[in-house]
């Protein structure tokens, strides 16, 4: 099964959500005791336009809806409870009476003729589309042509559905308080997979005019390729989403709209798709009451709807929309607005003004408001449903784990009410359609609800809120959960424009965070799956130590089933790199109290620690400066620095004025993520990492004085000074890594030359090959994209891997030769061993470095990466220097954010505006009259008729910025290569053919590396001791 798959359709339904012919109305059990029949109101009855005698569309009603003696008594329904049948349902039941409330006819018929109230789940509004008489499947219409009003037009209309419902609906009321009533323990058993859906259930609020603004235009979930596995029916009826039996609407939807048959003057339907014959009988002679008209639309289709007047909620367009009954019937809790309605808010302001402009979220509307302890954000761009389901499953497991901690003062069975999951999609037109379908299947998104413009203001974000009760299993299958499933409060923010991840975080922190005021914020990327209890361990670090302002866990490479992914050397090398970083680097920095980077893919922050002070200065202000680093006035240093904006946030948090926050590493928390498995992906990813980390490290070193404005103790400040020296030394080594590696290669090959002249015939060609590969990398990096030069980059990495194998052979050969020389001189002693330069400078230093790797891995009880990934890392490590570093510095000018031309306001969703006499009301404006359509068309022709202005070619600001960045790139690259070349020349040529200086330098270099490894080992050991007593 692919992620996103839903459980098989319930009994009596096909794969598209439609009831089968053989079981259109299956007998239902008696889940409730029988009650008396509801009183029957005067009702209307329509004739059948599909009959052979029909000459026109439905018109005047016949006031006779009572059951006839010839009709068997079927099911009747309790109007107060839409899901409660009163008596068994037969294949043909009596008509469900309509309310007596009448409205003015939409087509200008005499007002004296009463019209039935509109069907509340999205009935068509055109004059040809009279109201649904009832949810049952057989609807009778008046077939007498004499009943047609004089002005009735029998030709199909090609305009938008018309009609205006003047009833004013109030905004969504304050949600009822559920904190004390609903709990996990009171949730009944989940709905079994084989439950029978009754296709004749009337929808909630049937005949209730107060909800018509929602139900007349019930959203249609339209996709390029609707997938029945998500529970998305392929019906083109807007009502088929929530009421399976309420899809038998007859309306003129306009030319070519969804392929629905249109009615001609003789009462027959134009068979647009060959599904019907126009007389109510299908091609096979069977009754067509459940026939689907039209193919799957390849675009977002237009819905039949009525112009509505909707009162604004606190000045904003806020809608509460019924969720589909197909979804609700799979949920154990079916009462309460948070479970039965999805809340939509059209946000027209900047994220920083969200609270100031009086926008709010559901959690603040309860009485008392719900307190949010954990606020989890999942940022995504265009990732597919597989990655999203993986992340969402991990989050659901963690929330379920929190609800099982019955002894906790914070969590327990109602712990899900203290967690809000926020999903931020970067661009409405960029989101993956299948991921959007997953969100719709969970209930937190519905197509066709959003608007582009509200009262002249462009919508910046579409916010959907819903508490889902569905779950995602290990295979990515969506459906009812088991006994461990708990509700999940979900907040889906669909940004109108693509403005990158840092803008998504601004929505999370400055808009939603400012509204909910959470305690701990957890950051996740789509594709990263936290462990089943990892989020709890992250939260526990904040709960134990009040001075912890940020924390992170271990990032684990996805190994696949039976660790098959480790067969790829790229994945294995990254697995070793991640493991050693989590064993040595992160524990060391955690002991210091300052972790240079909390990965944005899996980290957590205390919300109050990130807030700015009264003057507006603080971590969040500096963090979001990076969002403006794509303008023409941005400097290249700042632009590259904010490629690693999470490093900036960490430094600003530790050095916050008059505070003493520290960062902590939580070994018990882990998250699994995909790592690049191809060379182009790895090269592109590391370019951003290397450039961002390098310039961010320079920023923290240059602004180290900020530390003195904090309230850290003298001891903590001294320890941070030690870490400053350590980080500076690491940065110097990273800068000269290119030259140092070549020196190591030269020393090893020259040492072999001293053992015999035959080695020269191998070493001299290898030197030329090394230089040629390096130059090849420079040429590729300056003019070729990794994705477009996959063979070139891959061949370079393979070439450096072969050179590394030769260097390993040389090191082992020299080690053995050194031991033989010492043994030949006499007894093997320590002084004799250290007296041999080659053995002392090369072998011992390398053994010390990698020996510490093995010891620290054993102490951490994680030795397996040394067995499965160590050798692959040794082969790929030279490419980290000679390929990845070269590409990063050659493209230091590439800081584009990809948002050029994104200032255009889309209008494909439509706009709403306030009425002239009441600013608190908005109406949906649709072109109806043919003259309006012609006027728009004439305006377009006039634009084409005008002569185009002469184009004047000028150099744009973007071009000037690009030229400036390229010049800086050239200068940085020149300085980097010249300094590394000067180092090589000084070390190799200063002694005039004698290799003693090069050998000595090599020994100092290797012992320095061993010393740094030992320093990291001490920090890792200290962390393990502290963790032992901290109770993590």
Curated annotation (Swiss-Prot):
Region annotation Disordered: where it falls in the sequence: 1-220
The keyword Cell membrane is assigned to this record: yes
Catalytic activity: [(1->4)-N-acetyl-beta-D-glucosaminyl](n) + UDP-N-acetyl-alpha-D-glucosamine = [(1->4)-N-acetyl-beta-D-glucosaminyl](n+1) + UDP + H(+)
Extent of Polar residues compositional bias: 65-78, 98-107, 143-160
Location in the cell: Cell membrane
Domain of life per record: Eukaryota
Gene Ontology MF terms: chitin synthase activity
UniProt keyword annotation of Metal-binding present: no
Record-annotated membrane-spanning stretches: 728-748, 762-782, 796-816, 842-862, 870-890, 972-992, 995-1015
Pfam families listed in its UniProt record: Chitin_synth_1, Chitin_synth_1N
Compositionally biased spans, kind Low complexity: 176-188
GO biological process, one term: cell wall organization
Keywords carried by this UniProt record: Cell membrane, Cell wall biogenesis/degradation, Glycoprotein, Glycosyltransferase, Membrane, Transferase, Transmembrane, Transmembrane helix
Knockout consequences: Abnormal capsular morphology: lower fiber density, decreases capsular diameter.
UniProt feature, compositional bias: Pro residues: 1-11, 26-41
Primary location class: membrane
Top-level EC class: transferase
InterPro entries: Chitin_synth (IPR004835), Chitin_synth_fun (IPR004834), Chitin_synth_N (IPR013616), Nucleotide-diphossugar_trans (IPR029044)
GO CC annotation terms, alphabetical: cell septum; plasma membrane
EC number of the protein: 2.4.1.16
Membrane topology of this protein: Multi-pass membrane protein
Family from the record: Belongs to the chitin synthase family.
Free-text function comment from the UniProt entry: Polymerizes chitin, a structural polymer of the cell wall and septum, by transferring the sugar moiety of UDP-GlcNAc to the non-reducing end of the growing chitin polymer.
Protein name in the entry: Chitin synthase 8
């Amino acid at each position: 099964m692919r992620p996103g798959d839903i459980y098989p359709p319930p009994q009596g339904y096909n794969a598209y959500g439609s009831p089968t012919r053989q079981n259109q109305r299956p007998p239902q059990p008696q889940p409730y005791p029988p009650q008396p029949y509801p009183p029957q109101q005067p009702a209307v009855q329509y004739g059948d336009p599909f009959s052979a005698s029909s000459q026109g569309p439905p018109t005047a009603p016949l006031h006779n809806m009572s059951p006839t003696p010839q009709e068997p008594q079927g099911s009747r329904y309790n109007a107060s409870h839409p899901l409660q049948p009163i008596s068994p349902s037969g294949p043909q039941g009596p008509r469900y009476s309509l309310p007596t409330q009448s409205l003015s006819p939409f087509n200008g018929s005499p007002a004296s003729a009463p019209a039935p109230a509109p069907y509340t789940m999205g009935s068509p509004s055109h004059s040809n589309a009279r109201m649904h008489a009832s949810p049952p499947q057989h609807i009778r219409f008046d077939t007498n042509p004499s009943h047609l009003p004089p002005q009735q037009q029998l030709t199909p209309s090609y305009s938008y559905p018309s009609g205006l419902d003047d009833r004013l609906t109030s905004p969504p009321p304050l949600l009822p308080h559920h904190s004390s009533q609903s709990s996990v323990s009171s949730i009944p058993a989940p709905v079994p997979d084989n439950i029978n859906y009754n296709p004749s259930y009337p929808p909630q609020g049937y005949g209730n005019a107060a909800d018509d603004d929602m139900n007349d235009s019930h959203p249609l979930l339209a996709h390029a390729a609707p997938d029945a596995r998500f529970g998305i029916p392929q019906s083109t009826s807007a009502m088929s989403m929530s009421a399976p039996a309420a899809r038998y609407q007859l309306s003129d939807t306009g030319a070519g709209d969804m392929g629905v048959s249109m009615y001609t003057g003789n009462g027959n339907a134009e068979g647009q798709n060959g599904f019907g014959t126009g007389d109510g009988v299908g091609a096979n002679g069977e009754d067509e009451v459940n026939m689907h008209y039209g193919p799957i639309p390849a675009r977002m289709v237009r819905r039949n709807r009525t112009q509505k007047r909707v009162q604004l909620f606190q000045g904003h367009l806020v809608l509460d929309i019924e969720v589909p009954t197909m979804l609700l019937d799979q949920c154990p809790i079916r009462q309460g607005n948070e479970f039965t309605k999805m809340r939509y808010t059209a946000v027209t302001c900047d994220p920083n003004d969200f609270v100031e402009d009086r926008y709010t979220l559901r959690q603040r509307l309860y009485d008392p408001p719900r307190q949010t302890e954990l606020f989890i954000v999942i940022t995504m761009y265009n990732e597919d449903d597989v990655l999203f389901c993986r992340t969402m499953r991990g989050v659901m497991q963690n929330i379920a784990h929190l609800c099982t901690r019955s002894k906790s003062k914070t969590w327990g069975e109602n712990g899900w009410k203290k967690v809000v999951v926020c999903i931020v999609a970067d661009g409405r037109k960029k989101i993956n359609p299948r991921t959007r379908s997953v969100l719709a299947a969970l209930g937190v998104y519905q197509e066709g609800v959003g608007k582009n413009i509200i009262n002249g203001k462009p919508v910046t974000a579409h916010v959907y809120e819903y508490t889902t009760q569905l779950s995602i299993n290990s295979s990515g299958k969506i459906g009812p959960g088991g006994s461990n499933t708990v509700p999940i409060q979900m907040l889906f923010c669909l940004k109108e424009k693509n403005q990158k991840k840092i803008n998504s975080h601004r929505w999370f922190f400055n808009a939603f965070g400012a509204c909910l005021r959470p305690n701990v914020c957890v950051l996740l990327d789509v594709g990263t799956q936290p462990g089943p209890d990892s989020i709890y361990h992250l939260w526990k670090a904040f709960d134990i130590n009040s001075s912890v302002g940020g924390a992170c866990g271990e990032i684990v490479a996805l190994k696949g089933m039976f660790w098959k992914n480790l067969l790829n050397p790229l994945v294995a090398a990254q697995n070793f790199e991640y493991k050693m970083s989590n064993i040595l680097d992160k524990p060391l920095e955690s002991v210091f109290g300052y972790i240079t980077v909390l990965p944005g893919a899996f980290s957590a922050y205390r919300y109050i620690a990130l807030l700015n002070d009264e003057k507006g200065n603080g971590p969040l202000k500096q963090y979001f400066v990076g969002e403006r680093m794509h303008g023409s006035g941005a400097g290249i240093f700042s632009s590259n620095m904010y490629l690693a904006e999470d490093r900036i946030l960490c430094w600003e948090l530790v050095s916050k004025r008059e505070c003493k926050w520290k960062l902590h590493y939580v070994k018990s928390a882990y998250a699994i993520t995909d790592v690049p498995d191809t060379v182009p992906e790895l090269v592109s990813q590391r370019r951003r990492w290397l450039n961002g980390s390098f310039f961010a490290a320079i920023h923290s070193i240059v602004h180290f004085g900020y530390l003195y404005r904090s309230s850290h103790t003298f001891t903590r400040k001294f320890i941070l000074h030690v870490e400053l020296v350590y980080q500076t030394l690491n940065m110097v080594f990273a800068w000269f890594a290119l030259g140092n590696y070549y020196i190591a290669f030269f020393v090893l090959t020259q040492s072999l030359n001293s053992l015999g002249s035959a080695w020269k015939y191998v070493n001299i060609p290898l030197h030329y090959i090394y230089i040629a590969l390096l130059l090849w990398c420079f040429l590729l990096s300056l003019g070729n994209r990794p994705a477009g030069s996959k063979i070139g980059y891959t061949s370079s990495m393979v070439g450096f891997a072969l050179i590394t194998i030769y260097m390993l052979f040389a090191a082992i050969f020299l080690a053995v030769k050194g031991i033989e020389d010492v043994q030949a001189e006499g007894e093997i002693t320590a002084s004799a061993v250290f007296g041999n330069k080659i053995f002392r400078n090369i072998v011992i230093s390398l053994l010390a470095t990698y020996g510490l790797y093995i010891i620290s891995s054993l102490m951490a009880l994680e030795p397996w990466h040394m067995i499965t990934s160590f050798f692959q890392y040794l082969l790929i490590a030279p490419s980290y220097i000679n390929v990845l570093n070269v590409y990063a510095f050659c493209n230091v000018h590439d800081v584009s954010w990809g948002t050029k031309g994104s200032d255009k306001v889309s209008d494909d969703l439509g706009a709403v505006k306030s009425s002239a006499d009441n600013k608190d009301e908005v109406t949906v404006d649709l072109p109806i009259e043919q003259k309006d359509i012609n006027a728009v068309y004439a305006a377009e022709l006039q634009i084409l008729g005008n002569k185009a202005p002469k184009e004047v070619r000028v150099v744009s600001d973007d071009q000037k910025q690009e030229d400036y960045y390229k010049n800086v790139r050239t200068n940085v690259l020149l300085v980097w290569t010249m300094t590394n070349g000067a180092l090589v020349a000084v070390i190799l040529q200063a002694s005039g053919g004698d290799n003693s200086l090069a050998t000595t330098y090599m020994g100092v270099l290797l012992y320095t590396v061993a010393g740094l490894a030992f320093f990291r080992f001490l920090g890792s050991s200290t962390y393990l001791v502290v963790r032992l007593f901290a109770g993590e």
